[in-house]
Amino acid sequence: MAGSYPEGAPAILADKRQQFGSRFLSDPARVFHHNAWDNVEWSEEQAAAAERKVQENSIQRVCQEKQVDYEINAHKYWNDFYKIHENGFFKDRHWLFTEFPELAPSQNQNHLKDWFLENKSEVCECRNNEDGPGLIMEEQHKCSSKSLEHKTQTPPVEENVTQKISDLEICADEFPGSSATYRILEVGCGVGNTVFPILQTNNDPGLFVYCCDFSSTAIELVQTNSEYDPSRCFAFVHDLCDEEKSYPVPKGSLDIIILIFVLSAVVPDKMQKAINRLSRLLKPGGMVLLRDYGRYDMAQLRFKKGQCLSGNFYVRGDGTRVYFFTQEELDTLFTTAGLEKVQNLVDRRLQVNRGKQLTMYRVWIQCKYCKPLLSSTS
């Protein structure tokens, strides 16, 4: 979608897709010639059918007692997810450097372009399959849940990591990565499918990457990964909705905050405060990069009655939850937190299963929001 564009370029250039988004379906007869098509416009009938489907699967809501359980024990459901799948569920997100060149700003863009061309098929496949637990969760959960009972339980690192964070006195002079010149935080890092590609690709000696997840199992998998380098990365357990827990960095210290399919797992009523807190961590000119589910994505349409928690907010069969956004909702969240829009676009893709002759309509939203630079008077 968005590629690198000159500083000060018109905002419309930020929404112009330069590398991805170039395969258009002009002849419906060719739909099964490729695995995916970009910028697929929906007909009025298709949009109306999607709206009806959502109305149908939203009629019956999850009882309040279960909703409380899903909220209180959210970290346990995600721990179970990572105990089952470990680091085998998601693929490394190498496509991020095409979508978000801000993650490797000092890298030669021609070098990144050459790398992309050499690995185009692999990168495109990973991007086409990019998702949260989403569509195949139900099937995998059914066949994998029993295996969880037989796995060797490893001690959680949550208490250990949380204690280390609480022992840190967060100040402007001394904190993990305090000597770095470019700092990135990924919230909801999972097992490192974003963090490790960043560390591998961005060789800036001044780079330091923070990553957090409220699943202690996920953080343990990050810390025990052979690619984990404490001199360049700090992984910690954190619940972005817990206002009592502080981040291990001072306010105004981060250049980039990454939210990839994570905000959608938060209860809608808690989203604004979470974004407000993250916004305060950004330097002036710092940026939030987000990619998440859009309204009427196929994953939303596939939910059954009885899985809806509230409007456009659902629970999966394994207890993890997901919200489906509109562009306007995300814009309100970020601008209310004092950030300015750089990019807010809908990625409508038609994915194709050529073997089964199936078409699948995906809807994702990608955003970039920037913290305003300080004025000379301030």
Swiss-Prot record:
Any single GO BP term: tRNA metabolic process
GO CC terms: cytoplasm
GO molecular function: tRNA (cytidine) methyltransferase activity; tRNA (cytidine-3-)-methyltransferase activity
InterPro entries per the UniProt record, alphabetical: Methyltransf_12 (IPR013217), METTL2/6/8-like (IPR026113), SAM-dependent_MTases_sf (IPR029063)
Top-level enzyme category: transferase
Location(s) in or outside the cell: Cytoplasm
Modified residues (Phosphothreonine): T154
CDD domains named in the record: AdoMet_MTases
Keywords per UniProt: Acetylation, Cytoplasm, Methyltransferase, Phosphoprotein, S-adenosyl-L-methionine, Transferase, tRNA processing
N-acetylalanine modified-residue sites: A2
EC number: 2.1.1.-
Reaction it catalyzes: cytidine(32) in tRNA(Thr) + S-adenosyl-L-methionine = N(3)-methylcytidine(32) in tRNA(Thr) + S-adenosyl-L-homocysteine + H(+); cytidine(32) in tRNA(Arg)(CCU) + S-adenosyl-L-methionine = N(3)-methylcytidine(32) in tRNA(Arg)(CCU) + S-adenosyl-L-homocysteine + H(+)
Family to which the UniProt record says this protein belongs: Belongs to the methyltransferase superfamily. METL family.
Protein name stated in the entry: tRNA N(3)-cytidine methyltransferase METTL2B
Source organism of this protein record: Homo sapiens
Gene assigned in the entry: METTL2B
